[in-house]
Amino acid sequence: MTRKTFTLFDPTLALPAIADAFRKLNPAVQWRNPVMFVVYVGSILTTILWVQALGGQGEAPAGFILAITIWLWFTVLFANFAEALAEGRSKAQAASLRGLKKETWAKKLAEPRFGAQWQMTPAADLRKGDVIVVQAQETIPADGEVIEGVASVDESAITGESAPVIRESGGDFSAVTGGTRVLSDWIVVRVTVNPGETFVDRMIAMVENAKRQKTPNEIALTILLVALTIVFLGVIVTLLPFSMFSVEVAGAGTPISITVLIALLVCLIPTTIAGLLSAIGVAGMSRMMQANVIATSGRAVEAAGDVDVLLMDKTGTITLGNRQASVFLPADGVSEAELADAAQLASLADETPEGRSIVVLAKQRFQLRERDIHALDAHFVHFSAHTRMSGVDMAGRQVRKGAADAIRKHVEALGGKFPASVSGYVDEVARRGSTPLVVADGTRVMGVIELKDIVKGGIKERFAELRKMGIKTVMVTGDNRVTAAAIAAEAGVDDFLSEATPEAKLALIRKYQAEGRLVAMTGDGTNDAPALAQADVAVAMNTGTQAAKEAGNMVDLDSNPTKLIEVVETGKQMLMTRGSLTTFSIANDIAKYFAIIPAAFVTTYPQLAALNVMGLASPASAILSAVIFNALIIVFLIPLALKGVKYRPLGAATLLRQNLAIYGLGGVIVPFIGIKLIDLAIAAVGLA
């Protein structure tokens, strides 16, 4: 997705949002927000009272009722505008995606190989399982998996990243997205989706989903706000008979008017957070989109904020991920050339970067030319997460390469023995933080290949920040325990899972969840799908398999596993924003008590004038100033709701103290200043 940024009140977003704010005045829309629905009903009632006042039957001056009515409607409109503006930012991002859905044609192959006959087919007619060829300067017509070839692909339309990426068969970079463009070479692609199910289609559906589901925390907060509203509604209902009784007993003043009661109710109920609550949720998803992460729901973003365990793959997240074969370490009685020959044979059909680096190293060290895999009449055994080894069966030979324990079991199952010298090499390589791969030819263990990887710069500091936030980091790797321990110590993670299988990952997630923790993880392979489906926050890589994307509740367009940390920070920022604005909204009430209560009852109880600490010009001015402030504060807080409260990697207790000081104390002080300034303005224009 092209990274187009918008200013907060960009005219291209603000003008449609204003129109949407009026459209949202539909009662069918308003009742979804119970607190703002009370304001909506109050606005209708004061409008009726104003019409009565025009006919000479008003309970208060028509001008006063009109002023209150206008600002009550503005309160509703400002809340609608905040939500519409947040939705507009997401819709603008969706519009750029819709531009990718142009009519394209595909070269559909009769057979799944390059060079086979093809026919031009509309992209809309492609079905899951069809095989197509895409050549230089052609647009990839549908989502799919590269099954042959390698090409440079421009994915800027989806990811916003201008640098082309390599997409090739095998490994973790085989997925391609419809709407991207091949810049050079060619690839044969197997289509993985039916029409209407493409990644772009799903992204558009996600960001344009009008009926956004409320998250559990949002529902809980809404219940609290509704409860407060009901309490204040009960208070307001009792004030009218209390006022009538007080006037009769005191023999002075006039009963409080319905208009003033409605104004008091609207000022006391938590309209600020109620008006911004939906906008905060939409903006959270929008911020994820700006980070090139598509969340399937606000629930996923919110869960990210509550996460306290991060499961991260070693390769690509903690290390650079470009492991390369660097050294052949032959077993006793085996020459280095023999080990290189066996390693190359076991890697001929291995399309992963590691497999190719073994073939290249054998060629560089011993001039072993890459052999024609078709001429060998061999059966290749591909790597799986369960066996944790790969290789070739040919001419009575079983050549395998893989993890030390997997090769040990394989050799012993065939009746062979695992040499102590090879175990020593495995431990030595592992202690260096490299990955040892053991090669065996039948029952004969040939030796060890060292795969070197490098821990990413700055990752240790990021993990230290997460630790301050109370988040536990766990590294997941297929490496043996010694290698995993060495890299874990270097990277600074709290724990690690070595020799990981899909079942082990799933069991670890369930263990943490049974302890009451929320778990986040990333994944890109089909073998990651069960764990992704179990995790509370599951970020699938865009380059990953279709199964991984469907199991996750977020998709990272940049396919950067380290993004998981940013996802968690964005989730925490959304929760902090909601909490901070709730605190501010409730703290606002103190100033409004001092403004409206004395104004409402001062004619009956003159002693209440002592509570007019702000020195407001008149009772009418005090009430109107409070109502105006109540409406305007929503507008002033829209930027904070959309941008989010500034997040710092601190402990929960420290963050709570800071936010209570800023938004709690600020919520008490700001209304006193705001209401007084509005009162001065009203007095200056002669409306007091």
From Swiss-Prot:
ATP binds at D350, E354, F383, S384, A385, H386, T387, R388, M389, S390, K401. The chain crosses the membrane at residues 35-55, 62-82, 219-239, 260-280, 594-614, 622-642, 668-688. The active site is at D313 (4-aspartylphosphate intermediate). It catalyses: K(+)(out) + ATP + H2O = K(+)(in) + ADP + phosphate + H(+). Part of the high-affinity ATP-driven potassium transport (or Kdp) system, which catalyzes the hydrolysis of ATP coupled with the electrogenic transport of potassium into the cytoplasm. This subunit is responsible for energy coupling to the transport system and for the release of the potassium ions to the cytoplasm. Belongs to the cation transport ATPase (P-type) (TC 3.A.3) family. Type IA subfamily. This is Potassium-transporting ATPase ATP-binding subunit. It comes from Dechloromonas aromatica (strain RCB).
